[in-house]
Structures are given as C-alpha cells and as structure tokens.
C-alpha cells in the first residue's frame, strides 16, 4: 500500500480518533502550513505546495480537477502536475472557499507563515525503526481510541444542494472553529502518542484507518474483514464499558462511538433530528431577548452529534446546507451560520412547534436527547432536501474496499485506489461558471467618501469618531430604504393582488405591517436631518442634538416590536396554507432583494439596539475637550436609548408571553370536564414546559423522552397528550390541571401521606415533599398530587434525566414561593391553643366573638361559654363563664350592652356585664336573662337601611322572623317586655328550609335550599312595607337553571359595589339588581366543596374541611390555599376571619386570619 497516498486521503476524508501507540517514536509535530481558507463554499480544493528544490520526473501523478456536485455543490481540486516525488513529500491541504479574498483557516491553529512540510515517508521510516525496539501491549493499543462510525469518503462532489442554495452563503468568520479537536478533513496535526509525546508517525493513522475500514465495509464477502470489525468492536466495548450505577447518556454514546443518530447523508433526516434535538432557550443580542433561540456553537455541536463526528468544519458545511434551505436563520438576518456563542439563530416558524414538542423538555431530557416515541406523534414533514455526498454509501451493492468500484462517483474510490496501489487520476474539470457572483454592497467608509486632504490632518481617534457618525448615517439610509421596500413592494402588492384571499387580506396587512408607516414617517425625517448635517461639512461636528429632537417620537418601535410575534405567526400560517403567498415570498427572496418578508420586518426589531451601539461608539471616540458639548448631549441620548430599550424589552416580553399562551390555548382540547385555565388573562405566562413519560424511561429506548407534555403556567400545572387525528395533532388534557396552591410533588414513585404532613404543619401551603423511605431515585420518578378537592388524584410520571427532573422541581418551588410572596400580607394569629378538645371532654367549639375593641374573646362550646381577656395577661387560658350545655351561637349588641345566645334551640338575651363577674356569671344569667324565642334553628344580626335587625329561622313550617331592635326590647325587668318584643316583630314564610341570611344595603337575602329570597326593608318601620320576592331568574341563564336541579347546602350573598356576589357550593358569580347574572364578569368554580363563605374585599374565601380557598373576587384567580385538618369558620368580619382546625393531638386550635 502506498502509505503516502493513504495518508493524504486520511488527512482529508477521515477523522483519526485516538492516540498513537507507545511503540511509535516520538518526534516533534509540525503543523501543515498550507492551509488556506477563502470564503466561497462552492470552491474547495486540495493542492500541494511544491517544494522549491523538487523537479518534475516522468512518473508524475497528475491529479485532474473534477466536479460532480449537483447545482452549487462544493468541489475538491487537487493541484495538477504533482510529481511522484512531490507525492512522497507531505502534501499540504488547501481549502478554498472564495467568499473573501483574505485567507483564513478553518481551525484556530496557528499556521506558520512559511510553508513547512512534513515528510510522511521519513516519519514512517522512523516509526518502523523504533517499533522494533518498543512493543506495546494490546491494552495500550486500545487506550483512548475512539472508533469512528461516520466515514469521510473521498467524493467528487462535496455537497448536493437543493435549489437556490447558493444564494445563502456566509461570512468567512463563520468558518472559524476552536483549535481542538482537530478536523481530519481540514488542517490537522498529527496525533500524539499514548505517553503524551508528539510524533509524526503514521502508525496511529493506519490503526484508525483499519478501524474505519472494518466499520465502513460495504460487502460481507470477506470473512477477514468481518473478523477485524469484531475484534475492534470488542476492544472498543471493553475499553468504554461502564457500571450500571453510572449510565451513559445518549450524548456520550454518540460522541464516544461516533454513531450517527440518523443516516448522515440525507439532509431531510438531519433536519428532522436537528429540530428534535437542538436546545431552545432565551438569548440576548443587541439589547433584545430572543426566545426559542440557540447559538451558532450549539447548532454545530448538535449537527456533529447527529452525524456522529468530531469534525466541526463538516458540521459547518451541513449547517450551511440547512440554513440555505431556511431551516433556521440568524435572528437579525445579517449573515449565515457561524460557529460562535455570540451569534444567535432561531428556527423557521413552521419548525418551532415541532422543536417545542420534541425538546421542550430540555429540562427533562438531556441537552441532545430526543424522543423516538414522540416522533410518531409529531409531523415528520420537512421542506429540507438534498444529499451530503461525502457521507453517503455507494449505490453499488457489490462495492467493497478490496476492489475498485466501477462507479466513478463512488465515495470509497480514493481508498480503493490506495488499497490497490493505483495512481490517482481522472475526474472532471472544475466549472468556473458555477462560482458565486461576488457582487456585494461594500460599505463605503467615511475616509473613502471624503478627500484625503480632509482626514489626513485628523487624529486616529477623530477619524474613528467620524467613521462611527458616518456609519450611523449610512445604516439609517439603508433602514429607511428597507421601509420603502416594505411599503412599495410588499404592502402594495399584497393589497392590490389576489395573493392573499380577500376575506383575510385587510386583516393580514394590518397586523403584519402594523406601525410600519409611523416608523417610516419618523425615520425619514430623522434621515433628512442626518443627511443635512453631513452635507454642511465633510467633518460632522455632532449628531446628539438631532437624536434628542427625534427620540421622543421613537415610541412606534414599542408597538411594532410588540406586534412581531403575532405578525410572524400570520406570515408562517399563510406560507403553510397559501401556496401563492409561499411562492411570492420565495420569489422575493431569490430576487435582487435577497430577503423575504420576515427578514425585512426584523430590521425594525433590531434598529433601536443598533442606535445604542452606534451612540456608544461615538461616545467612546469623542474627545472630552473638543467634543465637550456634543458629548454631554450624547450621554443624555444614551440614557434615553437605555430607557427605550427597557420599555421595548418589557413590551416585547409581554407580547411574546401572550402569544405563547394564545398558541397553547388553541391546541388544548378537554376530553371530559372543561376547566378554566385563565388563559384569557393578559398577564398569564408559561414558566416551564417539557416532556415526561408514563413508563419507566430506563426500560424503554435510550432516546425516549416522554409522551406527556407538561406546561407549568404561573397559576397551574397542565398535562397534555398528543394524538394524531386526520393528519392533525390534537392535544387532549391528560389529567385535570392542578392549581399551584394545591400541587404537591415528590421525587419518588410513591407520595408520602399528605394528610399527616398537613396535620403536623397547620396553616401550611402545598409544595415539594421529600420521599418517606426512598433515598435515591434511579428511575427519575416524580409524583404529582392534586390535594383536597372532589377531583383529587395522584399520578406518577418519569423523567429521562435527573437534571431535568431537578429543574422541574425548582421551577415549581419558585412559582409557589412567588404566590406566597404576593399574599404575604395575609397573616395568621393563634387566639386559643390546646385547650378545647372535642373527643376527650366533648368540648367542641361552636362559635366565637370578639368584643370590647378586641380585648375580650367569647367562645361558645358544647359545655358552656368561655371568656378570654387579652387585656389582663398574655397566654392565659380561657375562663369557664357560663355552665350551659350546647351553646350554638353568640352575639353582642354593644350599643345596647346586651348579649344574645342560642342555647338548646332557645334564643336568650342577657346583660353584657355578666362577663365581668366570672364567679357569679351563672347566677346573674339566671336572674337577668330572658327567653326571646323558642325552636330557633339559627339567627343573625346586622344593619340594613339604617336599622339594627335580628333575623331568626325556625325549625317548623320554614318560618322566618325579623326583629327590629330598639332599647325597649331589652328592658327585661319591664312588665311590657313581651308587648315591646312583639311590636318589632315581622313574620314571614318561605317554601324551603332557610340556610343563611345576608344583609345588603337596603335588602336582606334569605338563602334557602331550593331558592333565594330577597326581602326589601323600608325606611319607615311598617310591617306592610316589607316585600319578599325571588332573587334569581331561573329561565335567564342555563347556569342558574342547572343549579336548581339540586338543593343548596349553603348559600351566601355579599354586597360588592353596585352588584351582589352570590356564592354556592359549586360556583360563584355576580348578580345585578334585577337578579340576573352579569355575563361580563364570568362565573368561577370552586376547587373544593365549600361549607362556609366569607368576604374580605378584594378576596372571597371558601372554607372547606381540609383547606381554605382564597380567590380574587374580580377575576376568580386562586391566589392562596391554607391547608389544615377539620377546618371550620367561626366568625367573619370585614378584614378578619376566626376559624378553628384540629391539631395532631385532637385539640381545636382557634386562629385569626388577617387580610
């Protein structure tokens, strides 16, 4: 085998994985000096730097130019007239890309200015000599060897692009890559030996070649070839084997074995896998945040992973092919793909949805993991076509490395010629006419626009200042020209033709080109002012005053940038459903304009950021003395631009959030009960999203990510399941959405007992629980629990990676903490500790009351009345005041100094001063109290229309009595007591059992089991003036009609401004004065089954047995849930609620909830 020819092919078409054996001699390594990179991807050539002392002989191996690419495929040119002597010398690789006249290396290696050459023959002879004395063991030979899977074949044509691929070529800078790992296809150092020393020997190259030959075989005819493949495979597996406790991720497997994720020659497959694998996140460029974007380095990393190669330049070539077919683009449409963390790119809008589906769980999956199962549920249609020839297999079924293939375009041809010791030759000549047109609008600098005599006398700093000012002028001129193109080319043509259907044409133009005319009006005048200043003198004194004049009129940029997400959505929607529009956009892109609609519209997004950068440049090169006045104004301009950019960030961020929520709203389908997610709220945001699996991921395919897509909103957690129906993907709700205040999660397969946690931590909130017994989580399981509702459930899901699982947990913690911080003004205060026990002494708390300006607390229990005086001492125990059995309710009329108690279905009235004498309280109560009413089920006192009224409900005949309070009633020792009591009494009858009384401004609502009655209270106390009617109109609304199918358990009414807020066990809503539901304010459903209600504006509170539900009364948002065990509300005030709960020992703790 001709080792020189073989080494030439190795260096260009193969990557050499691993290091040389210890048997190889260690000689200093010299870099190939002939690497030349120019910037046109259509012309790639391999040439040999001729040695000055070399002479031509008769046996020269002429390497003809050849081109076999389709359309604008890249070409490899081997320099002609290469003698055999020159071939024996180390050939130097030249890569010519003709995008720029200045040479530039693909890698970051330092190239010697002199063309140093390495004689591979000499180094090989040295290795052979040294290998006789030093022999390495098999383990040493295998150490650190990475066997490649992707073959770097020699091919007449590097790329076979689809149409129009040649019009999207990049900047030369985009081809620069880090110096390591070295790419064998381009400038490459010889690999170091195992002992860390450098060597120029080709032994490691031959070893890697043998690995490539075994893995890239095309025929199974050779048993020797198969045995080599098995030998190297076994060695590789032994070397890279790992324990089960340390699983290898998909990324590690691909990069170690060089295993491509798809067939790397088909660009369509690479495009689909790229969409599924690329990690989308938020990046910032020129002061603006770009969501769902990625860096150039991430793109090349992902492409190298997909094709299973460490050659970043190879990834660059594939990236250019994909970018040329509009798979992704620079966010500013300024240049092509570059291998840099500073350059930001985004997928085409039609690809974003698929990318979200497959890798929106980047927090769940590894950075480059993809879901094989989700591919079945995702659309695999792609508009990317083409074949990457160097990575293709030969189409001949009989092709092998042992004989020369009959096909001249066989990718294995060069290696076959090397194996058979054939001379290089043949091929097609390069077609110069296929070279790209280099017509580029070169930017004219300020020094070229003015005579040399003008700037010769200026300092270097002043020249740079004038250059910055002139750049501001030229870029503004270009921007205004783009606006004119938008107005005259796009808007006018779309309005005057039938490209867009007539029914949506006006709306499309209105939203896509929103605020373009306002921006054009302002910037045209701004440009005129700049042009006038430039024309006054070749040396511009300054432009700060012009900026200060026009900056207040730059507000249309805010509205324009905020409208971009929706405009982009409309454009991509029309492209997908309207072939006429897609054709029009493609024609514009391929015309002299060279950009599509979206590219032109994006210039308005980046323009404010460019202003900030240019002004900063001008300030940097301004002289503090000579440019003092202009510099001071420029500092003001910079502050104003910073403020503008902050406002733009807020506006664009809010618009993007709103757009994301709208897209989510459109694709949600509720299979069973509809749940209001609050997506119509303008402040709703998607905080996190990803994929989880219903199955153990470790038992499935290594690339499996999940089949359940979750969305963490700022108010709840949503689970969706994708299903294909008639080529459309429906996203049905997998489980009922869980509000964050009721969401418990645990990183394990089993949830610890939540009830025990709530009982031991009273007044707690939902959150993350630690596993009870499990110390590790090898399956990456996570349990979600919906707590305390009629729809409560638990579901266990699995995450592909522990890092993603931890990210989800942290995001949930952040959102739940944010909700608590927003309601930190809601506080708790313990009024009575462990004193009342309902099981041991049957001393159940029935009612409480605060009187004497909050100094006295009265507690009514089954064993009597207790009093707690906070003014005398702290932490004292309640005093048993009255020894009466079963005191149900208590109320105090402080203006009359009377206490009213409901004891064993009898309503008593007694003087309030009995609470001051605890020792004689029983005697005073028997002596001075009077029975007001008998057979009383409940009572309530309050004010209505300026009168103090007591409402009494009886057990028999659904009777209701109204007592108008006056001082004569409570003269218990008077002989006219009963007469005075009867004088203020009004009797009513309702058709069902009364449940509650609600005092409104001049009405009293009586909530009954079957309906709601409203009682008008006249200003003048006339028994005939009290009128009762039914409040709700059954036939007015379907919601109300459905409510009457069942009897009510509890009903409460609260006056809110000019409306009435009605609360029922299922839902709540606003009523107007006519008793009709206010449709504009919505209808809110409770999470639980409330037993009591309270109102503390702007909050409405529903009391359940195991949690307190606090909602915003205007929009129904669930702001907080207070968890507990056996919760009961005792009394409610305007800004306070007294309630009790049961602690782990069974004591009833009385708490005060302050708003």
From Swiss-Prot:
Ranges for region Disordered: 100-249
Keywords linked to the UniProt accession: Acetylation, Guanine-nucleotide releasing factor, Phosphoprotein
CDD domains noted in UniProt: DEP_fRom2, RhoGEF
Keyword Acetylation: yes
Residues carrying Phosphoserine: 154-155, 433
Record-listed N-acetylmethionine modification sites: 1
Any Pfam family matching the protein: DEP
SMART domains hit by this protein: CNH (SM00036), DEP (SM00049), RhoGEF (SM00325)
Organism domain of life: Eukaryota
Biased composition annotated in UniProt, kind: Low complexity: 155-167, 190-227
GO MF entries: guanyl-nucleotide exchange factor activity
BP-aspect Gene Ontology terms: regulation of cell wall organization or biogenesis; small GTPase-mediated signal transduction
InterPro entries attached to this UniProt entry: CNH_dom (IPR001180), DBL_dom_sf (IPR035899), DEP_dom (IPR000591), DH_dom (IPR000219), PH-like_dom_sf (IPR011993), PH_5 (IPR041675), Rho-type_GEFs (IPR052233), WH-like_DNA-bd_sf (IPR036388)
Function: Stimulates the exchange of RHO1 GDP-bound form into GTP-bound form.
Name the UniProt record assigns to this protein: RHO1 GDP-GTP exchange protein 1
Phylogenetic classification of the source organism: Eukaryota, Fungi, Dikarya, Ascomycota, Saccharomycotina
């Amino acid at each position: 085998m001709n080792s020189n020819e073989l080494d030439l092919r190795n260096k260009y078409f193969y990557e050499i994985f691993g290091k040389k054996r210890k048997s190889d001699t260690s000689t200093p390594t010299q870099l190939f000096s002939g690497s030349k990179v120019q910037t046109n991807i259509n012309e790639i050539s391999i040439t040999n730097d001729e040695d000055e002392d070399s002479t031509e002989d008769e046996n020269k191996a002429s390497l003809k130019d050849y081109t076999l690419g389709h359309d604008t495929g890249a070409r490899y040119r081997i320099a002609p007239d290469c003698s055999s002597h020159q071939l024996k010398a180390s050939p130097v690789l030249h890569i010519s890309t003709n995008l720029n006249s200045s040479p530039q290396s693909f890698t970051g290696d330092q190239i010697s200015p002199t063309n140093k050459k390495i004689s591979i023959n000499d180094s090989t002879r040295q290795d052979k000599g040294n290998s006789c004395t030093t022999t390495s063991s098999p383990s040493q030979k295998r150490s650190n060897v990475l066997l490649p899977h992707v073959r770097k074949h020699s091919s007449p044509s590097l790329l076979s692009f689809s149409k129009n691929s040649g019009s999207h070529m990049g900047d030369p800078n985009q081809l620069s890559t880090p110096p390591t790992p070295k790419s064998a296809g381009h400038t490459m150092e010889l690999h170091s030996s195992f002992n860390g020393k450098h060597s120029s020997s080709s032994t490691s190259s031959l070893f890697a070649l043998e690995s490539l030959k075994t893995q890239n075989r095309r025929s199974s005819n050779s048993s020797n070839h198969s045995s080599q493949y098995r030998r190297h495979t076994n060695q590789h597996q032994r070397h890279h084997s790992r324990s089960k406790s340390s699983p290898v991720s998909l990324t590690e497997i691909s990069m170690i074995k060089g295993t491509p994720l798809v067939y790397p020659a088909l660009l369509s497959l690479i495009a689909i896998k790229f969409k599924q694998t690329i990690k989308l996140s938020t990046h910032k460029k020129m002061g603006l945040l770009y969501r769902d974007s990625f860096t150039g380095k991430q793109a090349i990393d992902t492409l190298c992973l997909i094709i299973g190669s460490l050659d970043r330049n190879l990834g660059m070539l594939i990236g250019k092919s994909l970018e040329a077919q509009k798979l992704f683009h620079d966010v500013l449409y300024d240049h092509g793909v570059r291998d840099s963390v500073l350059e930001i790119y985004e997928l085409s809008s039609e690809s974003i949805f698929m990318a979200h589906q497959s890798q929106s769980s980047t927090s769940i999956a590894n950075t480059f993991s993809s879901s094989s199962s989700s591919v079945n549920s995702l659309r695999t249609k792609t508009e990317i076509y083409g074949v990457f020839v160097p990575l293709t297999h030969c189409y001949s079924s009989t092709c092998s490395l042992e004989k020369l293939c009959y096909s001249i375009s066989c990718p294995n041809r060069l290696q076959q010629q090397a194996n058979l010791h054939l001379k290089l030759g043949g091929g097609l000549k390069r077609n110069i006419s296929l070279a790209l047109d280099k017509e580029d609008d070169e930017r004219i600098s300020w020094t070229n626009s003015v005579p040399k005599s003008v700037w010769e006398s200026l300092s270097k700093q002043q020249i740079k200042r004038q250059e910055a000012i002139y750049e501001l002028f030229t870029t503004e001129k270009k921007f205004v020209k783009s606006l004119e193109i938008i107005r005259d080319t796009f808007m006018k043509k779309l309005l005057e033709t039938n490209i867009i259907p007539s029914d949506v044409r006006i709306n499309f133009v209105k939203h896509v080109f929103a605020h373009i005319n306002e921006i054009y009006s302002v910037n045209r005048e701004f440009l005129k002012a700049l042009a006038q200043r430039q024309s006054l003198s070749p040396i511009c004194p300054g432009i700060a005053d012009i900026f200060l004049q026009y900056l207040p009129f730059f507000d249309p940029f805010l509205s324009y940038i905020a409208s971009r997400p929706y405009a982009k959505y409309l454009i991509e929607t029309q492209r997908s459903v309207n072939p006429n529009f897609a054709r029009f956009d493609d024609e514009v892109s391929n015309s002299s304009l060279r950009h599509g609609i979206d590219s032109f519209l994006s210039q308005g997004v980046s323009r404010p950021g460019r202003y900030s950068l240019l002004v900063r440049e001008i300030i940097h090169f301004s002289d503090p003395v000579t440019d003092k006045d202009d510099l001071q104004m420029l500092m003001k301009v910079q502050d104003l631009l910073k403020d503008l950019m902050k406002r733009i960030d807020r506006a664009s961020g809010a618009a993007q959030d709103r757009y994301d929520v709208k897209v989510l709203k459109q694709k949600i389908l509720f299979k069973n009960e509809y749940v209001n997610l609050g997506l119509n709220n303008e402040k709703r945001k998607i905080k996190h999203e990803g994929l989880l699996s219903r199955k153990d991921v470790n038992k499935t395919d290594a690339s499996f990510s999940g089949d359940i897509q979750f969305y963490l909103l700022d108010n709840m957690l949503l689970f969706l399941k994708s299903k294909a129906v008639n080529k459309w993907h429906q996203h049905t709700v997998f489980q009922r959405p869980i509000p964050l205040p009721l969401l418990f999660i645990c990183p394990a397969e089993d949830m610890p007992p939540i009830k025990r946690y709530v009982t031991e931590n009273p007044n707690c909130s939902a959150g993350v629980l630690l596993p009870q017994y499990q110390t590790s989580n090898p399956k990456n399981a996570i349990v979600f629990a919906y707590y305390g509702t009629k729809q409560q459930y638990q579901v266990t899901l699995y995450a592909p990676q522990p890092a993603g699982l931890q990210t989800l947990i942290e995001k949930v913690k952040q959102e739940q903490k944010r909700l608590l911080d927003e309601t930190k003004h809601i506080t708790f205060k313990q009024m009575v500790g462990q004193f009342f026990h309902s099981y041991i002494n049957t001393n159940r708390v029935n009612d409480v009351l605060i009187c004497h300006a909050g100094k006295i607390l009265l507690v009514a229990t089954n064993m009597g009345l207790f009093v707690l005086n906070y003014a005398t001492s702290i932490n004292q125990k309640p005093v048993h005041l009255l020894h009466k059995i079963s005191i149900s309710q208590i109320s105090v009329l402080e203006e009359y100094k009377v206490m009213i108690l409901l004891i064993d279905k009898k309503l008593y009235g007694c003087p309030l001063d009995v609470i001051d004498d605890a020792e004689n309280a029983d005697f005073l109560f028997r002596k001075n109290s009077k029975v007001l009413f008998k057979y009383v089920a409940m009572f309530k006192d309050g004010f209505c229309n300026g009168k103090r009224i007591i409402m009494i409900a009886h057990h028999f005949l659904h009777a209701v009595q109204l007592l108008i309070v006056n001082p004569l009633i409570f003269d218990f020792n008077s002989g006219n007591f009963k007469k005075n009591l009867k004088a203020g009494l009004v009797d009513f009858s309702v058709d069902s059992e009364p449940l509650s009384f609600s005092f409104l401004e001049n009405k009293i609502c009586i909530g009954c089991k079957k309906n709601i009655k409203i009682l008008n209270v006249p200003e003048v106390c006339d028994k005939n003036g009290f009128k009762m009617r039914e409040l709700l109109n059954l036939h007015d609304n379907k919601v109300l009609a459905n409510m009457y199918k069942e009897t009510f358990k509890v009903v409460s009414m609260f006056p809110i401004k000019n409306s009435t807020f009605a609360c029922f066990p299922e839902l709540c809503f606003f009523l107007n004065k006519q008793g009709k539901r206010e449709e504009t304010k919505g209808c809110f459903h409770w999470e639980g089954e409330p037993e009591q209600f309270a109102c503390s504006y702007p909050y409405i509170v529903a009391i359940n047995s195991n949690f307190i539900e606090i909602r915003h009364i205007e929009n129904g948002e669930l702001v907080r849930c207070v968890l507990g065990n056996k919760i009961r509300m005792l009394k409610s005030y305007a800004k306070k609620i007294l309630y009790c709960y049961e602690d782990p020992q069974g004591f009833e703790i009385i708490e005060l909830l302050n708003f």
